[in-house]
């Protein structure tokens, strides 16, 4: 089963080192929620996820369900799954409100909940929520530090760089303090994840990019174990050209958001995306899509038969990922998402 077994090790010492770091932690297989359909209909889906071998579910928060409600339902419905947010923006909840939500989830699912915090993007934070997208590194760092204090039951009175808290103490003290993960793209945030949190959450990268990212986290951790949770976009379909053409829309939408554009440049993919960026900035969306190569699609989107997809996901795990949090993309309209979910677990 993919969540507990992996393909052969890396090709060079660097990747072997990353695989060695990952091997100290259980390899886990997760699915992104919410699942298709209304939230009240997900109970049987969640049971089936656990039945076929998934260990985790990870929520997202953008324009659909909030990041906590699907997990709260899962906490009551399916006790076999670990529950995580990937991610909650550090900007869109005030500190005390954030601490209450985190503590409540940890109380509802003792020992099974992980909180993932990140900067999100200027689109979600500023354009959709009306909050200035300023000092993202400091904002995430401050929220992580505040949550660590608050979740330990301490009375927090402190001037952080990006907010202040005066006399707050949580009224809910979870039996188990939840791990805190940091969503990270480039070096500064990756170092924060390694130094001050329990792990990093990464996305929009290929399997071959993982060692570059994971090494920074582990170096910053100074020898302590850190999880690397990767959201991996997957479409198990062998209708290759249909998937590739549809994937280009998703890639263009994300890679023109400044934080993701800079991430791809840092990974070394800038030259491959220059044509797309130039066409997009010039207002020619059709040319921008055409400029995205099949190689870029194949690096960022896992697709092919279920066996091929499982092999590609295994490469992420071999290269340093500890939890593969799959996100099913219905890029092929013929895709049966429930069957795809089963097939990706090897069921």
Question: Residue ranges of each PLM-predicted region?
Answer:
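Active-site-adjacent structural elements that line small-molecule/cofactor binding pockets in enzymes
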Residues: 2-347
């Amino acid at each position: 089963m993919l969540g507990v077994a992996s393909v052969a090790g890396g090709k060079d010492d660097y990747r072997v080192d990353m695989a060695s770091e990952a091997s100290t932690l259980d390899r886990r297989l997760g699915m992104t929620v919410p699942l298709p359909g209304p939230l009240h209909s997900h109970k049987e889906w969640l049971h089936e996820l656990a039945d076929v071998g998934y260990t985790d579910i990870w929520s997202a928060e953008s324009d659909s369900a909030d990041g906590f409600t699907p997990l709260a339902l899962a906490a009551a419905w399916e006790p076999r799954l670990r529950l995580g947010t990937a991610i909650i923006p550090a900007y869109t909840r005030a500190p005390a409100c954030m601490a209450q939500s985190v503590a409540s989830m940890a109380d509802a699912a003792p020992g099974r909940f992980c909180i993932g915090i990140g900067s999100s993007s200027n689109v979600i934070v500023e354009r959709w929520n009306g909050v200035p997208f300023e000092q993202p590194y400091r904002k995430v760092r401050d929220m992580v530090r505040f949550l660590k204090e608050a979740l330990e039951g301490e009375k927090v009175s402190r001037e952080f760089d990006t907010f202040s808290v005066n006399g707050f103490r949580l009224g809910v003290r979870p039996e188990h303090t939840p791990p805190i993960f940091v969503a990270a793209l480039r070096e500064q945030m990756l170092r924060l994840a390694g130094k001050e949190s329990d792990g990093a959450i990464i996305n929009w990268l290929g399997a071959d990019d993982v060692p570059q990212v994971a090494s920074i986290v582990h170096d910053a951790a100074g020898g302590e174990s850190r999880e690397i949770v990767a959201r991996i976009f997957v479409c198990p379909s062998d209708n290759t050209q249909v998937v590739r053409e549809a994937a280009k829309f998703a890639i263009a939408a994300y890679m023109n958001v400044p934080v993701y554009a800079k991430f791809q440049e840092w990974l070394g993919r800038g030259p491959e995306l220059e044509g797309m960026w130039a066409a997009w900035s010039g207002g020619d969306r059709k040319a921008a899509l055409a400029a995205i190569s099949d190689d870029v699609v194949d690096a960022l989107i896992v697709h092919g038969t279920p066996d091929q997809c499982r092999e590609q996901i295994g490469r992420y795990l071999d290269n340093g990922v500890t939890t593969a949090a799959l996100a099913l993309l219905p890029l092929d309209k013929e895709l049966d998402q429930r069957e795809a979910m089963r097939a990706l677990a090897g069921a």
